[in-house]
Structure formats: structure tokens, C-alpha cells
Amino acid sequence: MNESNSQDLTRVSPFYIKEGFSVYEFTEKLFEAYVIERINRFLVKVTLDGEEILVHLHDPGRLKELIYPGNLVLIRETKGNKTKFSITAAYANSRFIVLDSRLHNIIASKFIPKIYEKEVKVGNSRIDFKYDNTYLEVKGCTLVENEIAYFPDAPTERGRKHLKELRELMRKGFNAILLILVMRNDAKCFLPNEKTDPKFSVEFWDSIKEGLKVYIKTFSLIGNKIVYVGDIPLCKTNLT
């Protein structure tokens, strides 16, 4: 996938998404806290102004390079959880990386036509969006190593299933898109994480061979806004 192809998705939007455009703004105050320990997939103990509290983490990934004792995080008050606060972002490589996966589809909706269906049932799965003759699945990415963004950071049977469903849809004549949101701006290209989930990697490359379009968009947290930085390509390998 070359740079010109990576811009196609913005061109089908009801408006052109320029680099530097704010795709989400937090209305809640963001507080600095420090990680003490991760209790389980969705619960983290932090210290806020010297007080130990439990906060919600809405990201099932391993996040070992982001959620570890002593690391700086941003938290905000949220509703609908057992805890008062949720982790919004974690600090790494001189920047904050947004971790809340509830925001992914909100952000993705900025890049597609205004008329669309959400959570469309396909086989035994649900695909995030459908518009016109196109099905679009969204994946959030937070792992970057040596300027390469990787997904997933933990084995994902659900992710593999989504790719299989997209391939079946393409065989029926539909268009299929995988939109990857890299929630940081220090990556130059993207690869599926073969080391962590080799089965997902195989499905990823096989799906591309069958016509799946992949778009990778990067973002930055600036103040209380998530800002679109730009697109990055797939890294060059013997499979691209």
C-alpha cells in the first residue's frame, strides 16, 4: 500500500479530514496519576495526589510498556463503571498514548460518510460500520517498537474472526476495509504482530491478497484533544 492509496478513505468522507484536525475533545478534567499495579484486565491501582484509588482501564491489551508500576497516566471521571475514574492515556516515549477503546468508533466515524449503520451483524460477528457497499472494521493500536506500530499486543481470536468475516463479505461482492487507529504519533509504518499472534498475521496478509483495504491513521493527544496526525503505510516486507 503506497502513500496515495492510504489517503483514499479520507476522500470518501463528507468532508476532508486535514492533518491537525481534532477528532475528539475531552470535556472532563484530566488528572495526572501514577500506576501502582494492574489488578486485572480492566482494573488498575494508581496514586492520585498521594491517595491510592482503583481506576477502570477500558483496553484489554497487555499494555506492558504502558501500564507498569511508577508510570504516569492521565485519568478522568467517567460514568457506568464501578470506579469513579478511568484511565485515559499513559506516558511513553515523551508523549501520552490514548488507551480508552470506547473512543475508537467515535473517532472512526469522522472518516466515513455521515449515513452509515453501526455494529452490523455478519455471521457470528458484528462489524463496526457499513456504508454504501462497504463494511469497515476498526482496530485500535497502542504498541510501537522501533517506529513500527504493531497490532495486536495480545492474541485476539475476535480480531481473527473479524478478518474471516470480511473475507467472506468480499467474496459476496462487498468492499471491506480495516481501519487501524494508532493512538500515538511515533510510528512510521505498521505491521501485524506476528510474534504475539501469528494466526492473526496470516489472516491479515491473506485478507489483503483477497482485496481487503487497510488504512492506518495516527493520532496525538494535545491538551484535552485527540488530533489526527496523518496516515502511515504498511511496512515493506516480502508480503507487501
Curated annotation (Swiss-Prot):
GO MF assignments: DNA binding
Source superkingdom: Archaea
InterPro entries (UniProt xref): SfsA, SfsA_C, SfsA_N
Coiled coil: none
CDD domains, per database record: SfsA-like
Family: Belongs to the SfsA family.
The name this protein goes by in its record: Sugar fermentation stimulation protein homolog
Organism: Saccharolobus solfataricus (strain ATCC 35092 / DSM 1617 / JCM 11322 / P2)
